[in-house]
Amino acid sequence: MAVPKQKRSSSRTHHKRAKIYKAFSVAVTTCPNCGAPKQPHRVCLRCGYYGKKQVFEVAK
């Protein structure tokens, strides 16, 4: 059975875990219909359009 040759220091362990649990930023684009910020490949929540197609009606 494999056994580590030396103890892994706590700072090395924390450094490794920091990369695993790193928060990533969400990509944001503008809606071509209304110009509102939205996530790519998602329906715009302000106008209800996905590209040039209306997916749902937005209550005003």
Swiss-Prot record:
GO terms for molecular function: structural constituent of ribosome. GO terms for cellular component: large ribosomal subunit. This is Large ribosomal subunit protein bL32. The keyword Ribosomal protein applies. The lineage of its organism: Bacteria, Thermotogati, Thermotogota, Thermotogae, Thermotogales. It comes from Fervidobacterium nodosum (strain ATCC 35602 / DSM 5306 / Rt17-B1). One of its GO terms (biological process) is translation. NCBIfam families: rpmF_bact. Disulfide bonds: none annotated. Keywords: Ribonucleoprotein, Ribosomal protein.
